[in-house]
UniProtKB/Swiss-Prot annotation:
Part of the RNA polymerase complex. Its cofactor is Zn(2+). GO terms for molecular function: DNA binding; DNA-directed RNA polymerase activity; ribonucleoside binding; zinc ion binding. This is DNA-directed RNA polymerase subunit Rpo2C. Binds 1 Zn(2+) per subunit. DNA-dependent RNA polymerase (RNAP) catalyzes the transcription of DNA into RNA using the four ribonucleoside triphosphates as substrates. The Rpo2 subunit (Rpo2N and Rpo2C in this organism) is implicated in DNA promoter recognition and in nucleotide binding. Belongs to the RNA polymerase beta chain family. It holds the Pfam family RNA_pol_Rpb2_5. GO terms for biological process: DNA-templated transcription. Its EC number is 2.7.7.6. NCBIfam families: rpoB_arch. The lineage of its organism: Archaea, Methanobacteriati, Methanobacteriota, Methanomada group, Methanococci.
């Protein structure tokens, strides 16, 4: 650090300015010395920023800190004696922290540190030494093998997608009633593993399978990260999973002695659905186990008393009309009833939980990813007999595109495929831990010793023609993860359905049976093509058409009086018969436009609409003929 004694340096404690000093280096070294002696809390950190000329001392909670070995005069304070004592159990890791052998640094103080990866790299300038290079990475990134050979964004993607991968996260899934669960049928331990996995116990709860991967283009079906799958491998169970969803219902009690009831609702109940929706319910109003249900089917029949007191008061002379409050399967989902559990809540109300099971076999559009951020969706399934095969008869499980490798620089995946091949042939696990895994040349030598070419490529033959490919194909074993993003949970279409209360436009989203938004950019395309009728159809007729009568005299909305059979304008007093349209014609506009006009009125702006005669679409041909005749007359 440069000597800046002539300048006053600001001192901040947890972001608050507490004072200044003209000897920043002495202060920083003094605080670090006190921390190492145990006179200050071990998680206290101090950082001196020369550029901004300030010292930050942090003691607050919520900071990420990590342990490092302290280095003084080019030598680590951790000795062989410490390690022997640790092995014998005479001292603990906490004792090393108290002695100042190991200290915790946060992100801010790490900027002042010069950290060596290994003891061989240590110099006089180094301040700290990594306990092990693998501590650089967190849990998500540490699971990926050979991450030092990948670009940083791909490691970040791999860490994010690892959290979405399917496996068996707990051993009691058969008895659990989670709101949602998705489990892989045959998870495998990865052939190429890391030390992070051992520490985490990943092998006990793996989340993926070892795929035989070939890197080659296949008739254009694996362009843009699509993946070609071996259909026979899928039939044997590759990537198969089960999705569970739990629905629950409770018999609530209400003031006045009324309560919900589990039953098959009568036809007279308010909100009664069609008979077909209740077909799987048994006498007690609860669905039968192993029934196949789909979206909209009732799985727990339930009726409730009138929602508001006014409803009950209206029907007080008659028997109060109950309403249907049954539990239905979500729109777009289906499955078999796996389990039904009847129990009670703390208040003593009956509670029923229904678990629905759905088998998810990989299909076109399902998302898969390697541990190197190479994600893709299934683009084609091909029978095994039509896929390329090697001289030894190996057929790949998946084929990925070669264009996915160069620009993304995921060399770690190529090394994993090489290591997976060696591990499968030798029957052992390969270590792919960051900076300390098995070296590339060792894997190449092992392949040569096994009778394969050191570069991992093999001669392959076309499954359809039997002809040998002109080039050798890179083939190996990589660990692939099936992700939760399946096409079955995303596919959506709608012809008609619910609309919003305010705008009267279709609802949004798959869960609400919503429409597909026709946005500004799509609108501009139709304008550019001059497709006026299609534009009108999309933006009004199929969205929120609204018939309203407008006064042709003042241009404001008129009022319909169906009882008297009249239309009248509240502004200028124009009156007209309901079936006439000379003074107060009917106009079809988008309801959103009517809402806009109402909102303008609320801000004391009165918009007026000019109304003219229109040409009916049915009479358009006659109208054109008249124009043509008039043109002919004018020429004569």
């Amino acid at each position: 650090m440069k000597n800046l004694a002539s300048r006053e340096v600001n001192i901040y404690v947890n972001g608050k300015l507490v004072g200044t000093t003209d000897k920043p280096e002495e202060l920083v070294n003094f605080i670090r010395e006190k921390r190492r002696k145990g006179e200050l809390p071990q998680y206290t950190t101090v950082a001196y920023n020369e550029e901004s000329n300030d010292i930050h001392i942090n003691t607050d909670a919520g900071r990420i800190v990590r342990p490092l070995i302290v280095v003084e005069n080019g030598k680590p304070k951790l000795t062989k004696e410490h390690i022997e004592k640790l092995k014998k159990g005479e001292i603990t890791f906490s004792d090393l922290v108290k002695e100042g052998v190991i200290e915790y640094l946060d992100a801010e103080e790490e900027e002042n540190a010069y950290i060596a990866l290994s003891e061989e790299e240590l110099t006089e300038k180094h301040t700290h030494l990594e306990i092990d290079p693998l501590t650089i990475l967190g849990i998500g990134a540490g699971v990926a093998p050979y991450p030092e050979h990948n670009s940083a964004p791909r490691i970040t993607m791999a860490a994010a997608m690892g959290k979405q991968s399917l496996g068996i996260p707990m051993s009691n899934i058969k008895w659990r009633l989670d709101t949602r669960g998705h489990y892989l049928h045959y998870p495998q331990v990865p052939i190429v593993r890391t030390k992070h996995q051992e520490i985490l116990g990943f092998d006990k709860r793996p989340a993926g399978q070892n795929f035989v991967v070939a890197i080659m283009s296949y008739e254009g079906y694996n362009m843009e990260d699509a993946i070609v799958f071996n259909k026979s491998a899928i039939d044997r169970g590759l990537g198969r999973s089960t999705f569970f969803r739990t629905y629950d219902a409770c018999e609530r009690r209400y003031p006045g002695g009324q309560m919900d009831r589990f039953e098959i609702p009568d036809k007279g109940v308010r909100g009664y659905r069609s008979e077909e929706c209740y077909r799987y319910l048994e006498e007690d109003g609860i669905v039968a186990v192993e029934s196949h249900v789909k979206g909209g089917d009732v799985i727990v029949g339930k009726t409730s008393p009138p929602r508001f007191l006014e409803e009950h008061e209206i029907t007080i002379q008659v028997k109060p009309q109950r309403r249907d409050s049954s539990v239905v399967v979500r729109h777009g989902e289906e499955g078999y009833i796996d389990k039904v559990i009847l129990t009670e809540t703390k208040e003593g109300n009956r509670l029923v939980k229904v678990k629905v099971r759905d088998l998810r076999i990989p299909e076109l559009g399902d998302k898969f990813a390697s541990r190197h951020g190479q994600k893709g969706v299934m683009g084609l399934t091909v029978p095994q007999e039509d896929l390329p095969f090697t001289e030894s008869g190996i057929v790949p499980d998946i084929i990925i595109n070669p264009h996915a490798i160069p620009s993304r620089m995921t060399v770690g995946q190529l090394l994993e495929m090489l290591g997976g091949k060696v591990g499968a042939l030798e029957g052992r696990r390969i270590d792919g831990t960051i900076f300390s895994g098995e070296k590339e040349w060792d894997l190449r030598k092992a392949l040569e010793a096994l009778g394969f070419k050191h570069h991992g490529k093999e001669v392959m033959y076309d499954g359809k023609t039997g002809k040998k490919f002109e080039v050798e194909i890179y083939i190996g074993i990589a660990y692939y993860q099936k992700l939760h993003h399946l096409v079955a949970g995303k596919i959506h279409a709608r012809s008609r359905g619910p609309v919003q209360v305010l705008t009267r436009q279709p609802t949004e989203g798959r869960a609400r049976e919503g429409g597909l938004r026709f946005g500004e950019m799509e609108r501009d395309v139709l304008i550019g093509h001059g497709a006026a009728m299609l534009l009108k159809e999309r933006l009004m007729d199929e969205s929120d058409p609204y018939d309203i009568c407008i006064c042709s005299k003042c241009g404001d909305f008129a009022i319909l009086d169906y009882k008297r059979g009249l239309k009248y304008c509240p502004i200028c007093g124009e009156i007209e018969n309901l079936y006439s349209s000379k003074k107060i014609p009917f106009v079809r506009i988008p309801y959103a436009f009517k809402l806009l006009l109402d909102e303008l009125k609320s801000m004391c702006i009165l918009p007026r609409i000019k109304v003219r005669d229109k040409v009916e679409l049915e009479d358009f041909e006659e109208f054109v003929e008249k124009l043509e005749k008039e043109k002919v007359k004018q020429k004569q």
